[in-house]
């Protein structure tokens, strides 16, 4: 475990000076595909040895992918949410841990779009266009609901000061900016953007989950950290201001699960085709000719295609709704569309990563193959927000017309 602004190897986020410019959807998909080709070869080793993807994340920044949702009014390409989803699917099929690290980056940018002032947008969008990364200092540890916040930002004679301890801080170790939820002197929820190298900021690499092992989603401590007013976003206004930041954040989470499912199915197909033996009673020479296996591969592919179709539909809904002023009804519509997709991507990620072993057989469990990482990654990531509450959200909307609560998990 390491503590302070560096990890065990002494790495710090590099100055963001060399980000490429992406101007259209085709360039974004090409950049994601090329990056995925770099992520894939060592993904198993990084998972097994818990090697943090520093070089890979710096390579991600250099592609310019981190700026693809920056609005055109602020110098960005403002690409579609369908493209954003495809980028995450491509990256997470190659390495879902490295692919998840930018998730909070885009979720926070969506919040900046909805709640940020003009000064804040000009400041932070410019940083992103230069290639800087946004992390996250997530919910606090303990038995309280994740909405419970003890982190405080207070006004002092020397300016604003941030104090607290947060966990589930995916991306923070690699980030230039570390936003966190805090309560201000008036008891209101705000989001505070702390600079990674600000005095009093400590990132602790204590993430020890059995899946998504290299996201470095551990602890961040803020000890009387100095911040400027421009670094404080009024999250409390979200309750009365319809927006899309919650659905956008959830959309990316669903895309991560879609990528995990794709990787599991691809590995199942490859193992059955190249390594698996036929069952003795089948009378076949190849496992790939077993009708029960053919049935299951067909079922997995069908379920995956259905989940992906609903995911891309949800992204299209967000593209449509983001082009016009957001109302309470359209904000709810966005949350519903994404919840429907999130259910199916969760279920196919878990199903595919489990069924893989039924189809591939005992030899597929050898540690050398590392196929268990698909299930471990799917199981850990899908716990981010329980599907049972997505079903509840949908039932309450369709039966009672109830709008989903506005937060990053809806």
Task: List where the protein language model places each region.
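Glycine-rich phosphate/cofactor-binding loops in nucleotide/flavin-utilizing enzymes
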Residues: 358-410
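Amphipathic, small/basic residue-rich leader segments at the start of a protein or domain
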Residues: 1-102
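C-terminal helix-coil-helix/basic helical segment that borders enzyme active sites and/or dimer interfaces
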Residues: 44-47, 305-343, 357-362
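Glycine-rich beta->alpha junctions and the first turn(s) of the following alpha-helix
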Residues: 209-304
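A short core secondary-structure module
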Residues: 168-203
């Amino acid at each position: 475990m390491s503590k302070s602004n560096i990890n065990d190897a002494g790495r710090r986020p590099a100055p963001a000076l060399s980000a490429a410019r992406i101007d259209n959807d085709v360039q974004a998909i090409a950049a994601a595909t090329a990056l995925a080709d770099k992520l894939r070869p060592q993904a198993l080793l990084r998972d097994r040895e818990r090697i943090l993807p520093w070089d890979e994340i710096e390579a991600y920044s250099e592609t310019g992918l981190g700026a693809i949702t920056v609005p055109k009014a602020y110098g960005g390409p403002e690409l579609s949410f369908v493209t954003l989803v495809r980028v995450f699917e491509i990256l997470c099929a190659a390495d879902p841990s490295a692919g998840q690290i930018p998730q909070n980056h885009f979720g926070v940018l969506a919040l900046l779009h909805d709640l940020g002032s003009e000064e804040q947008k000009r400041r932070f969008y410019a940083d992103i266009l230069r290639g800087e990364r946004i992390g996250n200092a997530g919910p606090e540890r303990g038995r309280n609901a994740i909405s419970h916040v003890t982190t405080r930002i207070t006004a002092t004679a020397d300016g604003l000061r941030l104090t607290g301890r947060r966990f589930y801080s995916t991306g923070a170790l690699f980030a230039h900016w570390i936003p966190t939820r805090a309560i201000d002197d008036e008891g209101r929820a705000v989001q505070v953007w702390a600079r990674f190298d600000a005095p009093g900021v400590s990132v602790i690499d204590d993430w020890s989950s059995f899946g998504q092992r290299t996201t470095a989603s551990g602890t961040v401590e803020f000890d009387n950290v100095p911040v400027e007013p421009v670094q404080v976003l009024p999250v409390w206004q979200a309750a009365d201001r319809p927006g899309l930041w919650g659905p956008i954040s959830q959309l990316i989470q669903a895309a991560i699960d879609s990528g995990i499912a794709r990787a599991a199915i691809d590995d199942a197909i490859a193992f059955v085709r190249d390594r698996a033996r036929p069952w003795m009673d089948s009378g076949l020479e190849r496992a790939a000719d077993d009708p029960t296996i053919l049935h299951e591969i067909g079922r997995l592919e069908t379920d995956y295609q259905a989940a992906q179709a609903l995911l891309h539909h949800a992204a299209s809904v967000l593209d449509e709704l983001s082009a016009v002023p957001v109302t309470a009804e359209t904000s709810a519509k966005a949350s519903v569309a994404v919840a429907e997709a999130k259910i199916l991507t969760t279920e196919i990620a878990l199903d595919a990563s489990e069924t893989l072993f039924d189809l591939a057989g005992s030899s597929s469990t050898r540690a050398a193959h590392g196929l268990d990482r698909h299930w471990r990654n799917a199981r850990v990531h899908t716990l981010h927000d329980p599907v049972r509450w997505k079903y509840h959200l949908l039932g309450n909307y369709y039966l009672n017309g109830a709008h989903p609560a506005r937060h990053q998990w809806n």
